[in-house]
Every structure is written in structure tokens, then in C-alpha cells.
Amino acid sequence: MPSDLAKKKAAKKKEAAKARQRPRKGHEENGDAVTEPQVAEEKIEEANGRETTGDGEVDLLTKELEDFEMKKAAARAVTGVLASHPNSTDVHIINLSLTFHGQELLSDTKLELNSGRRYGLIGLNGIGKSMLLSAIGKREVPIPEHIDIYHLTREMPPSEKTPLQCVMEVDTERAMLEREAERLAHEDAECEKLMELYERLEELDADKAEMRASRILHGLGFTPAMQRKKLKDFSGGWRMRVALARALFIRPFMLLLDEPTNHLDLDACVWLEEELKTFKRILVLVSHSQDFLNGVCTNIIHMHNKKLKYYTGNYDQYVKTRLELEENQMKRFHWEQDQIAHMKNYIARFGHGSAKLARQAQSKEKTLQKMMASGLTERVVSDKTLSFYFPPCGKIPPPVIMVQNVSFKYTKDGPCIYNNLEFGIDLDTRVALVGPNGAGKSTLLKLLTGELLPTDGMIRKHSHVKIGRYHQHLQEQLDLDLSPLEYMMKCYPEIKEKEEMRKIIGRYGLTGKQQVSPIRNLSDGQKCRVCLAWLAWQNPHMLFLDEPTNHLDIETIDALADAINEFEGGMMLVSHDFRLIQQVAQEIWVCEKQTITKWPGDILAYKEHLKSKLVDEEPQLTKRTHNV
């Protein structure tokens, strides 16, 4: 007969099997169900980067961000009713409304998030996409407690921990079980409990946790050496990658990502796209990259006119479906308006005529009343279209910039970034620089502008050439207390009339109150537009654009692409947006191994090359991680 211990083990296994068949209240990898909402919230906060161990000191910037988020939450009001079953893994909320500082962002709409679907949330800058994600992440909408949520909100704070440690520790249940198992390993009296712990750890694949964490970090660009550096030695962009790695490692039931590609290079973007394709629960993603949305999403949610509208398929399918629906809607609208005009005209002409005509007029009046009562088709309200503009720069004879035998390293004993570069660029140059992080793409732009000097060799520039460089930190140079109008008038005093400057700023999507509000009150996307307006009116011959799409919406990026294509001068671009590169670049230059080589195909061929590299690297990575 089976022993009592064997019976208990069998019972535990059955219970564990049942638990695996239903979603857990805590994180999927945290095991046992979380019964206290407060505990669940603490786990989510810890996962999002809050320091919970050590000396208890919180990075000052992190504290400021927390205070800022609290103020935003206090100014936010959300109402909605859960319409799906409380135990369902799908989330259906009706009568959803969202206001911020009294401004209505959503009104009486519905939120539908189904298990196994990956949603792209799209809409114009400032329409409230990030605000909606925050409301979901903070559970201000009625989402059942058994659905755990991970909302990636900020970078990891600087600390003594390594990226690998930070990713591993996010799985709090596994870490607790391993500590408990280690304690009980020497106590024979707790043999049964120890076996239960080992069984649970086996369910969590605890022995593979480090390998999985290392694989995720590698995909996001961390070499084995970088995975063991201290977090305080990384920039904010790299610490954001660590936070993203934690989100992917913990595998929550609902994952909310707001512009996850902003701090990634093309290699990491391709890896992340392939990784998210395998996400089997609920993913809600805000991204400005059409290519990324096409690769990841199974559904699109369009935030428009205070409503959430749902489309099946990726971004390209959404565009096609929306166009067809709007064409049909306008046909229906015009048909109804024609019918209404005809009936009103008939009623006016024959309402007081002969008995027969009067009866017909009354019949048409009843038909008209029924049409009005049942609701008429609305006219299609199109999104506002932007039209960016780079002023004519005039012609200067080639060569504009000559790079002759240039080598560069940041320090005398540091690694060589470039060695013996030799090339020229002119006003007809349209180049995208690609390559892994650290290969020197941004460094090259700084060398060409003169912000950095070559270690060896020479860079010759035409005496009259003007260069405009857009980079990720340009926003930091803005005077936040000034309005866009005041800032531009200060930067370009030769423009005396405010109305003339208003027209200039208006071409970059800043209108009305946005022009006269303090810059600090603008969204990140609107601040980027101020920077683009400032850059354009420097009247450069050469545009050097380093990640110009961060924080911009899809419509703004398309307007930027059109403006670049109409620009008379030369352009060099660093971007993780494959579609923008495809739109504006005539050549692809690969920065790698201390040199620059011209890619023989277009950017889409380069993307396929990166995908094939991922397939080739996977077995080597697994083998290397096993040997760690």
C-alpha cells in the first residue's frame, strides 16, 4: 500500500496541476495565489524597479518620478463597469470614462482585452494612450485581482546590483523557495516539506532561471561581461533595458509596454519583436513603429474621438480595414443626407396640397422621424494631418564633408571605435547608419559636427556648411519655463512678429494653447516638435538625425519623412524605426568592427539578416550560459 508521504505527494501534485490550469492571482512565476490585493501591488511595484532591499535609500530621481506619477494619478478620474465574468481570463469593461485635470479623454466607451491577444494601442500625441495604460496598471479600472499586471513605467534606479541579479530577483516566489530549500536541506525532520519545495521549484523551472534571464539580457544587447557590471555604471537607457528584461522574465498575465523600443538599437528591436510574438497572455503595446506593430500585434485599438475602436489584425490590416469602413460610412452618410433633403423638400412642397399628396407627405414625415430617432450615420472625422518643413538651404559645391584616414578612441588606453575611416558626404547624401549599440553611430555624427575630434586623421568641411544635429537629449536644452512661442522668439530674434512665429511653430503640429503654454506642461511628443522646429530654422545644409522618432506618433513620423524627402540638403539618420529608414534612406551604412561598410540591399533585407543572426546565435548562447 502507498505510504502516507506518497499519498500526500500525489495530492500535492494534483493540486499543483489544477493550479496550473487556472491563472494565478500573483505573477505567473510567483506560484501560490496572492489573496491580498496589497501584496499583489507590492510585488508589482517591486517588479517595476523600486528598491526594496539594501540600505533603503531611494534614488532622488526615482523619488521625483514617483511623486510625479502620484500627482498624475490624483488628477486622473476613471469610471467603468466590469462586464466579463469575475473569474474569466478576458477583461471586458463597459461605460469606461477617463478624465485628466477635468479634460475628457474617453467617454462611455468599452475596453476589451482577451487572453492570447497582443494589442497595439494607437492614436495621436496627447490623446491619452499613456494615461490609459497608467489607469489599467494602477487598477483604477475594475480588473479582477486574479489577473496580475506588469506596467513598465521607468528605468531601474542605480544600485550595486548587476543586471542579472536585478532580473533574477524579480521572481520573488522562486527566490523565497530557494532560500527556504537551502535552510531545510540540513534538517531531516522537514524532509516532506523540502520535497514539496523542490517539486514547486521544478514547476517554476528554477534550475533554468539564470539561463533564461541571461538569454533575455543578451537579446536586449547585454554581453556576458555587461550582465555582471553594477547597475550604477549604466546610463538611464541601459537601466531601462534591465527594467524591460524584468518584465519579460516574470511573464505576467497582462503586460503593458509604453514605447519599449525607444532605448533599443535595431538588433535589440528585432529580438524584442520575435520575443513578444510568443507572448500568449494579454499584451497592450504603445509604439510609434509601424514595422514593430506589424510584427507583434494581433489586434489594434484606435483611441480616437474619446472612443476605443477595435480592429482585428496588425497595423497594415488596420489601415486597410479602417479605410474601407470610413469609405462605407461616408457613402452611408451622404445617402442619408440626400434622403433627408429629398423628404424635407417633398414635405415642404406637398404637405398642404391635395389629399393624396398630403398623405404621401405625412408618410414621408413619419419615415424621416423614424430615421432621426434610430440615429443617423456620423460624418467621418479624420485625424489632423501635419506638414513639417525644412527651409531651402541653398547650394554649396562638393565636397561638403571629407573624412580622411580618421581613427577615434575616447581615451588613450580605451578601445578603438573607428580605424582609418575614409569617405565623403554631399548635399545629395541620404544615409542611415545601422549597427549594434556601442559600434559608434552617434559618435560618428559627433565627429562630423566637430563635437568630438579625431584621434588620428582629418575631417575637412566646406567653409559655409551649416549642420543641424537632432539628438535624444535635445529636450534637456529647452527652457521649460518659456512657452514654445517665447522660446523660438528668443532663439530667432530676427523674426519680430509673433504671428509669423506662430505660423512657423504651427507647421510642426503645435497650435492654439500649446504655443503659449509653458514647455514643461507639454507632452514628450510635443517637446520633440519644439526641438524639430528649432532645428529646421537653423537652416542647415546637412541634417544629422539621431533617433528623431522617440515620443512621436505615427502620423508625425510620416510628416517628418515627407519633410526629409523634400529637403534640399543632405541627411544622415540613426534610428530604430525600420519604416522611417525605408522611407528616407537611399543607402545603408553598417557601423561595426571599427569601420563602416555599405550594405548591399535595403533596410528590410538588413532586418532579415538580423533575424538570421538570432537563429544562429541561440544554440551558442544556450551552450555559453550552461557553462556560466
From Swiss-Prot:
SUPFAM superfamilies: P-loop containing nucleoside triphosphate hydrolases (SSF52540). The modification Phosphoserine is found at residue 517. One of its GO terms (cellular component) is mitochondrion. The modification Phosphothreonine is found at residue 223. Residues 91-330, 401-618 form the ABC transporter domain. The keyword Ion transport does not apply. ATP 1 binds at residues 123-130. Transmembrane segments: none annotated. GO terms for molecular function: ATP binding; ATP hydrolysis activity. Keywords: Acetylation, ATP-binding, Nucleotide-binding, Phosphoprotein, Repeat. Signal peptide: none annotated. It holds the Pfam family ABC_tran_Xtn. Residues 40-53 have a biased composition (Basic and acidic residues). The modification N6-acetyllysine is found at residue 309. ATP 2 binds at residues 435-442. The keyword Lyase does not apply. It comes from the Eukaryota. SMART domains: AAA (SM00382). Belongs to the ABC transporter superfamily. ABCF family. EF3 subfamily. This is ATP-binding cassette sub-family F member 2. The gene is Abcf2.
